[in-house]
A protein has these predicted regions:
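C-terminal segment of classical bacterial N-terminal signal peptides
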Residues: 17-25
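Non-catalytic extracellular/lumenal accessory regions of secreted precursors
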Residues: 26-66, 74-77, 156-189, 294-295
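Acidic, Ser/Thr/Pro-rich low-complexity intrinsically disordered segments
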Residues: 59-124, 129-134, 141-142, 202, ...
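Edge beta-strands of jelly-roll/beta-sandwich modules across compartments, strongly enriched
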Residues: 68, 136, 140-157, 271-286
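Beta-rich globular "head" domains
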Residues: 188-221
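Sec-dependent N-terminal signal peptides
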Residues: 6-16
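Noncatalytic modules at the cell exterior or secretory-pathway interfaces
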Residues: 126-145, 252-273
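Solvent-exposed serine/threonine-rich low-complexity stretches and specific carbohydrate-binding patches
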Residues: 102-115, 168-174, 221-223, 231-246
Length: 297
């Protein structure tokens, strides 16, 4: 009876996972595999990477390992998600490449995420930064667990995107271009420290930058300027002239962290003095949820 209750509890947990698992849409392909994939040579062929296909595994009590292989296109950064229940404590999972090199490993219960929810899981990162599609293997080992085991595997994107708008305090002042320099005159500098801003994901990389502000009096031939001050000493000038807004050539290839000190000033050609207040910085970013405990911001 105790064994029946344990199996029933495990199956109920699995039903909860299937009901609320984020990648299992109505049209998703859910395949049940009843063991038999105990080595690399006999690995279940998952096929090409897809976020809509998942595997429900029934691992017989006389088998220690479950192996699965899949292909991943170039320039993809993904993760494999393995469901977990308390009955499976001591199980562990591994990610390996086609040369059997270990890429990532997670162990229960210490590496289990969302343990206090109905869908605890373990996650394995997989990066294909090569120039072609590659084959990868996942190995699930029962550890010291006894009896038949039940778990679900799925694949998910790791790279997410987001954006935020932040306000500089203070007012930038420009003395005016009294010498009528063709280079114009820069204003005073405003500074904004986003180093510990909790609304920005850890490790977020900037993909675009824009600014806005209110100049008084409003003038022509004004360029906003921005500096990612923690990582660079180079000021970026807006790609167009405007007293109210600026846009910049900064993108993900620059690898600037969103969480850093940003500085702002503006350049004016006009001879008259001016000020700019209500200056805002808008950042778009991408981030790897492997750096956030696999949580989205």
């Amino acid at each position: 009876m105790k064994r029946f209750k344990r199996i029933l509890a495990t199956m109920l947990a699995l039903v909860c996972v299937l009901a609320v698992f984020p990648t299992m849409e109505a049209e998703a392909g859910i395949v049940t595999v009843n063991g038999g994939c105990t080595t690399r040579a006999t690995a279940y062929n998952w096929g090409a990477y897809s976020t809509t296909n998942s595997i429900t595994v029934v691992l017989p009590e006389n088998e220690d390992d479950f192996w699965v292989k899949f292909t991943l296109p170039k320039d993809k950064r993904v993760y494999a998600r393995c469901s977990y229940s308390n009955e499976n404590e001591s199980m562990y999972i591994e990610m390996r490449n086609s040369s059997n090199v270990l890429l990532d490993a997670k162990y229960s219960p210490e590496d289990v995420l969302d343990m206090d929810t109905v869908i605890p899981f373990m996650a394995l990162a997989c990066d294909n930064l090569t120039a072609s599609t590659q084959t990868y293997y996942i190995r699930v080992n029962r550890g010291t667990c006894s009896g038949t085991m039940y778990f679900t595997l799925s694949m998910n994107e790791r790279i997410k995107t987001g954006r935020g708008t932040f306000t500089f305090s203070g007012t930038a002042s420009n003395p005016g271009n009294s010498s009528i320099s063709l280079s114009g005159v820069d204003s005073s500098v405003l500074s904004l420290n986003l180093t510990n801003n909790s609304t920005i994901p850890p490790g977020a990389i900037v993909t675009s930058v824009s600014t806005s502000g209110t100049q008084s009096p409003s003038q022509g031939n004004v360029h906003h300027m921005i500096l990612p001050a923690t990582e660079s000493s180079i000021w970026y000038t807006s790609t167009y002239a405007s007293a109210t807004s600026g846009n910049y050539t900064i993108n993900s290839t620059d690898s600037f962290a969103a969480r850093q000190v940003w500085q702002f000033k503006y350049n004016a050609l006009a001879t008259a003095k001016s000020t700019m207040k209500s200056v805002k910085l808008t950042l778009a970013w991408e981030y790897d949820i492997a750096n956030t405990g696999y949580k989205s911001y």
